[in-house]
Amino acid sequence: MMKTSAIHSPFEAPNTISLVAGTGDSNNPLNAFDMSLLKSGIGNLNLIRISSIMPPKADIIPLPKIPQGSLVPTAYGYQISEIKGETVAAGISVAIPKDKELCGLIMEYECVGGKKECEDTVRNMAKEGFEMRGWEIDEIISIASEHTVENIGCAFAAAALWYK
């Protein structure tokens, strides 16, 4: 009789999460995006875009010092506009379950509009995600950025996952 064992991932699940946000304005969309990353503190990292799941028991902490060039799992939202005077926003929320054995949810949202609208929306998205799962929320943490375009502008918000 063959023994079966659990399948193990070759990747270790991150155990910290940091919420960051920033804005940028430049003469082209990519540099506006890059400036927003720099202002959020993650501009010199290689972001690996992930879906919106926070590993169980991960701690929410201020952004740690991560070596430049590191591959960093990140959920993020951003809004770019080339319309001078237009206001753009991006937000991210993390819903933490009461049952600490469950994963948390990361929700990202971006819009043409203001920071309050964006942050309210992204928090409601987290609530709905928990309702769909039938889980109870312990806490929702969120952050958002807002930018009024001068040339080409970008609002950015992210949840960067890392390791203790």
Swiss-Prot record:
UniProt cofactor(s): pyruvate
MF GO annotations: arginine decarboxylase activity
Free-text cofactor note: Binds 1 pyruvoyl group covalently per subunit.
Superkingdom of source: Archaea
One matching Pfam family: PvlArgDC
Keywords attached to this entry: Decarboxylase, Lyase, Pyruvate
GO BP annotations listed: arginine catabolic process
Residue list for modification Pyruvic acid (Ser): S52
InterPro entries reported in the protein's UniProt record: Pyr-dep_his/arg-deCO2ase (IPR016104), Pyr-dep_his/arg-deCO2ase_sand (IPR016105), Pyruvoyl-dep_arg_deCO2ase (IPR002724)
Gene3D superfamilies for this protein: 3.30.60.30, Pyruvoyl-Dependent Histidine Decarboxylase, subunit B (3.50.20.10)
SUPFAM superfamilies: Pyruvoyl-dependent histidine and arginine decarboxylases (SSF56271)
E.C. numbers: 4.1.1.19
Catalyses which reaction(s): L-arginine + H(+) = agmatine + CO2
UniProt site (Cleavage (non-hydrolytic)): S51, S52
The family this protein is said to belong to: Belongs to the PdaD family.
Stated name of the protein: Pyruvoyl-dependent arginine decarboxylase
Lineage: Archaea, Methanobacteriati, Methanobacteriota, Methanomada group, Methanococci
The encoding gene: pdaD
